[in-house]
Amino acid sequence: MSGRGGASGIPDYLQMPLGRFLEALSSGEPAPGGGAAAAVSVAMAAGLAAMAARLSSAGELAERADALREEVAPLARADAEAFGRVLAAYRLPRGSEGRRERIEEALGEAAGVPLEMARIGAEVCRLAGRLALEGNPNLKGDAVAGALLAEAGVRAAAELVEANEPEGERALEARRFVEAARRAREKMAQGGG
């Protein structure tokens, strides 16, 4: 696969060289944006956790971190696609039949993608925090970096959920994931106590 757009016209960010992704992120285009950055942050955090687990002889944790990375990384593109559908819904003529419903549906979908990022990120934060405490001490810095990146990704994703759906269960659930990540980070910082 190349970094070029698929059927949706959105590039496969996972196939882009990092420099090109960063250029795209800083361009004047609406996507990639915060959702893609949050997904990539959580994916990098999971990668660090997997590395720390492997070098700590914690194979099960490494496998779980790999699975989380593979689950969250494609959400970078999914978020951009969902945002594109929001923009398309808002471009429908005002007063047209079904416009309001299409906007609400698109916003709901746009909230669902970062909610999934937040869920995954909270688990990555717990896993990386555990590795910082119990893993190979030579890799504590990598595990801590993973936990902090994961928490940042969770917080960013939760903000996007609330931006798209400020009221309702999804916003509350996103806040719970932020709280879970915060607790995991604090537990790690306190040495597990």
Functional labels for PLM-detected ranges:
Residues 2-193:
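Conserved, well-structured ligand/cofactor-binding cores
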